[in-house]
């Protein structure tokens, strides 16, 4: 179980595993030591695997693919850094199949995107924006990471990891 550090005990976790006991795995690795980003990495930020066990936020750069969802905070703006406080660079990314379901709280998803309704027969696939936040905008078969299951409120979404199963999707809702 991940817990916020004592330095910021009131900070809410922005990613909550709903179905993950057997459906998802926290994949251990390291945050890219050369990482230089001007945004916070929050639990729920889409991450890419650079090489070996080294991760960085997925920003949609050409030649990269999303790998999973961040489990930890590296958020200087919020005053929480669960990586540098350990001094090791250890980092964790949630990976899983299409049975892994997570609740994601804002601001860990793109609140400025045009979010479709989840009613009806269409599937709404998600990718990441240039800050690694989940978004329905710009989805392609190569960059999809999850499927939108529900939007319980304006600051909460429920997603199902869905990296590779596009066989029954004829149109990537929210895509280009």
Language-model features, listed with the residues they occupy:
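Surface-exposed, low-hydrophobicity beta-strand/loop segments enriched in small/polar/acidic residues
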Residues: 1-176
